[in-house]
Regions:
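An acidic-aromatic substrate-binding cleft motif
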Residues: 2-25, 30-39
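The substrate-binding groove and active-site-proximal loops of carbohydrate-active enzymes
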Residues: 11-23, 44-62, 108-127, 152-157, ...
Length: 550
């Protein structure tokens, strides 16, 4: 398996939905795409009802017709499994496939992603449609790769259906073996939370303080379980597609919360595709940080995070116009030159393939305001003119494909601390504050850096490529990670550790030792006392090189 995309040259693509348009438009669309340098189209990620209109009755004639035309026009295709949008008949007949909120209320048909990831019945239907598609469409040479599902964990990354509670118990049984071990690791003696039967265990439900708030150690295990479920869900599809895929790649698009993408890469997915919408930084109800808040660099942060998963990756959805659903999100239109800027920003961070969303703005449905390269009128516009410039750019620098991004600075990150910080009001804000602080400093000084996923599998060679490593938030820190960091420093590497280092163990419990815990010898210090500033207290500063640093 690759873990990096393999393109012979920089390549342009676009997301296309022939099912939304009259057949009379298809050929002209494909020919115009080629005029603008587009060589690859993504298809079918939302077309389950078209391919299985009734249970067990498969009809691939629509896609046979279109793929024949795509092959005739020498257009390459990334074909998708449509499991993000189960058809109405499935959701209605099999309510056990539906997701639920923390209070047990089901999420019904009418939008997308109303399903859960653990229902045996839903996994059965996913397996069937994936297998039928893989076997049927294998004959089309124009298909160069497969996208599994679409944006897993996007609409929601929490699951509370009956099958999720059952699968959570099975996950904990596999992880801890016995109730005695689970009770000890989860500290359930506190507040008389001790479990005496596996059936007493549930995902975090409504409690005296709200929905989704429970034992903090169990909450951390819950997120690990959600990631485990998502990886298993996609791995099932990957294994089926792999049987007939040949040398076609298998990917999925992201990146979203509560999902360990490194484990996903080990489960049968070749590399990750990122969905890049730079104006999300201004449109998702985020507070204004004032002048210099670097919202324009938000995509740089996410692209670097993607590169930690796949050193060379692709963009499956690059923002092409203003965007938003009819009930949320207000993304402004790209300014003149900005579409080109965003495209080159993706390339500069390691993308060898950039696919725009979408070819033409849809004239119906929830995304009528999510504009593509073409407007509703299908007439030439400034975005298409700018695409011509991007085509020329790609031709001029096409040979940089395959060349990895080079950085001497690495920011260590890990899913344990990310997930632990999500509901920890003491440590969560510090994680974002410290990581963002390093990101801002490196960006302002134009210093290339990588995010480095620190995992059990990380070895010394992975770290020694960096002259400087920063671990801004290592609240959860294991002895094994300290040992490899100690080797890195002993071999001449420079390491900066953030505040609250070593505060917790792998289960989120606080060891009976002074901070920084296992890293005390490595850091050469112990922390005797610490505090937050009380409300109204002035900010503390240190003077360094004639500067006041908060």
């Amino acid at each position: 398996m690759r873990h990096s995309i393999e393109m012979e040259k920089l390549t342009l693509g676009v997301c296309y939905y022939p099912e939304h348009w009259d057949r009379a438009l298809w050929k002209d669309d494909l020919q115009r795409m080629k005029q603008y340098g587009i060589e690859v189209i993504r298809l079918a990620e939302f077309s389950w009802a078209l391919m299985e209109p009734e249970e067990g009755k498969y009809d691939f004639s629509f896609w046979d017709e279109f793929l024949a035309l795509a092959a005739e026009e020498n257009m390459k295709v990334v074909f998708c499994t449509p499991t993000a949008t189960p058809p109405a008949w499935l959701s209605e007949k099999y309510p056990e496939t539906l997701n639920a909120d923390g209070d047990g209320n089901l999420m019904y048909h009418g939008m997308r992603c109303q399903h859960n990831l653990t229902s045996p019945k839903y996994l059965e239907f996913c397996e069937k449609i994936t297998r039928r598609m893989a076997e049927h469409f294998n004959k089309y040479d124009c298909i160069i790769g497969w996208q599994l599902d679409n944006e897993v964990n996007c609409e929601t990354n929490e699951y509370y259906s009956k099958s999720d509670h059952e699968a959570f118990r099975a996950f904990l049984k596999e992880r801890f073996g016995t109730l005695d071990n689970l009770n000890e690791k989860m500290g359930t003696i506190f507040w008389s939370q001790t479990y005496t039967d596996w059936d007493q265990i549930h995902l975090a439900r409504r409690s005296t303080v709200g929905t989704g708030i429970a034992n903090p150690h169990m909450q951390l295990e819950q997120v690990r379980f959600i990631s485990h479920s998502a990886v298993h869900y996609l791995a099932l599809q990957a294994s089926i597609v792999r049987e007939t895929a040949g040398d076609r790649f298998i990917t999925t698009n992201g990146i979203f919360g509560n999902l360990d993408y490194q484990k996903l890469m080990e489960s049968g997915v070749d590399f990750i595709m990122y969905d890049s919408y730079p104006n999300f930084a201004y449109a998702m109800d985020r507070p204004d940080g004032g002048e210099g808040d670097l919202k324009d660099r938000n995509s740089s942060f996410n692209l670097a995070r993607t590169r930690a998963i796949s050193p060379l990756f692709g963009i499956m959805e690059q923002q092409a116009g203003p965007g938003g659903w009819n009930f949320r999100i207000h993304q402004a239109s790209p300014k003149p030159g900005q579409l080109r800027l965003w495209t080159m920003q993706s390339v500069a961070h390691g993308a060898d393939f950039v696919s725009f969303f979408r070819w033409r703005t849809c004239s119906f449905g929830t995304e009528i305001y999510w504009h593509g390269l073409n407007d509703y009128s299908n007439r030439p516009n400034r975005r298409l003119e700018e695409l011509s410039l991007v085509k020329a750019d790609f031709e001029a620098i096409k040979d940089i494909a395959g060349h990895p991004y080079e950085a001497a600075v690495g920011i260590l990150c890990d899913y344990d601390n990310e997930w632990d910080g999500q509901k920890d009001v003491w440590h969560g804000p510090l994680r974002n504050f410290s990581t963002d602080g390093w990101f801002r400093s490196l960006q302002k000084k134009h210093i290339p850096f990588d995010f480095v996923d620190f995992r059990e599998e990380t070895n010394l060679k992975d770290l020694e490529k960096y002259e400087l490593l920063v671990y801004p938030h290592a609240a959860i820190l294991t002895k094994e990670r300290v040992e490899i960091l100690t080797q890195y420093v002993a071999n001449g590497g420079k390491l900066v550790m953030g505040c609250r280092t070593g505060y917790k163990d792998i289960y989120g419990r606080c060891p009976m030792q002074p901070m920084p815990g296992e890293a005390a010898e490595l850091c050469g210090v112990t922390v005797e006392d610490f505090t937050f500033l009380a409300p109204g207290e002035p900010m503390e500063y240190v003077n360094w090189n004639k500067k006041r640093i908060p």
